[in-house]
Amino acid sequence: MHHHIIQSRSFHSSACGTRAVTPAVRTLQVVAACALLVVAGTSAFAQDPTRAPQATPPTGRGGTQGPQFVSPEVSTDQHISFRIFAPQAQAVRLMASDIPGNAQNNQLTKAENGVWELTIGPIDPGAYRYNFNVDGVATIDPRNPAISESNNNVWSLVNVPGSDLFDTKDVPHGAVAAVTYKSTALDRFRRMHVYTPPGYEAGRERYPVFYLLHGAGDNDDAWTSVGCAGFILDNLIAAKKARPMIVVMPAGHTSRGPNSPIGRTAAEEFVKDFVTDVMPYIEKHYRVLTDRANTAIAGLSMGGGQTLNVAFPHLDRFAYIGVYSSGLLGAFPNAAPAGRGGAPAATPPPNPPPTAAEWEQANAASLDNAALKKGLKLLWFSTGTDDRLIETTRATVELFKKHGFAPVFVESPGGHTWINWRNYLSEFAPQLFQTTKAGTQN
């Protein structure tokens, strides 16, 4: 039993360009918008944040309410103006930790017409999440239809154009599907996003498959919203820098409960769901090549740890492995600061992840198998030098070298941010499947 929604990215504005709104996303938008109506007293719907201001803003159910304005507004000199109508509010802050320069908790200024405003910049080209905090209540921007889900929240998105990686270009575009499937491993329905390359719907060709995993703070929406994965692939494929491929972005969290996302139970549940349900679903419902040479996996932060936990017990199925801002999470107690995504805290959490020695022992059959090593075409790591997990990555790379692997390790500038993760995807994807022919299996 499955529910499969194919989405053309030509309907609704997004920070990375255009994408459709899924039923799940639409529900989240409605909930967030209703919260804002209570705070701001307006029901005006959003305008495209990448366009110039319109003469007359759209009307809500009660007609045009409040002053006419646009938010966010990106100027040609790469400044961003954020605005919100909240005439009764005492304080409004911008929550946008992803924006360089730390825009977290920036105070907006209130005008006589009840519109609060803040301009920041110049900001480097990119897609950025933000919310408003209105008298202690977090809310999305009601004038902006572009949103991005996280694991426990919904964010507004703003795009500062000028990125060669993911700006919308006049090239053939693929499609993104939101797919709901029944997980037999977890006995519940789950969702994943699937990118298919330009021409997939009209053709019969089979494609390589790339499984791309998100981090602890996100869900399966993240790579296609703030991560801009579809547009990055569109542009790489159009430039003949990457092979056309199907990209599968599953949900990384198996529970919203208290379990650590890198703890043993959560890790085991994810691997079981991935191998038992996600991969078989994709191989049944999509025209993918299923041999090892045409299968890749990568992930960021928590997803990087999950990548290693999936790939090495099943190394006969993956020829390309990518780890972004991550490693064997929690395996090296002195390698990273305590906290989510880092090493265990001073008081170990319940159900801690395996130590490095335990992980090596559990995966000895793959780590010391010469034939499996030979079939692994790429083991690729990249982490920013300011990233809190840089020492975890370095220790993980050394572990694989000790077992005779030849990992590629790129230390980039920057930290634990989407700015880096989009770059890592754009560097990793062109290295995939270049030795295999389209539509064939080795």
Locations of the language-model features?
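N-terminal start and proteolytic maturation junction detector
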Residues: 12, 36, 57-58
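N-terminal export/targeting leaders of redox proteins
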Residues: 4, 43-45
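Non-catalytic cap/lid and distal C-terminal segments of serine-dependent acyl enzymes
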Residues: 47-64, 68-105, 110-442
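Bacterial N-terminal signal peptides
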Residues: 27-43
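N-terminal secretory signal peptides that target proteins for export/translocation
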Residues: 1-26
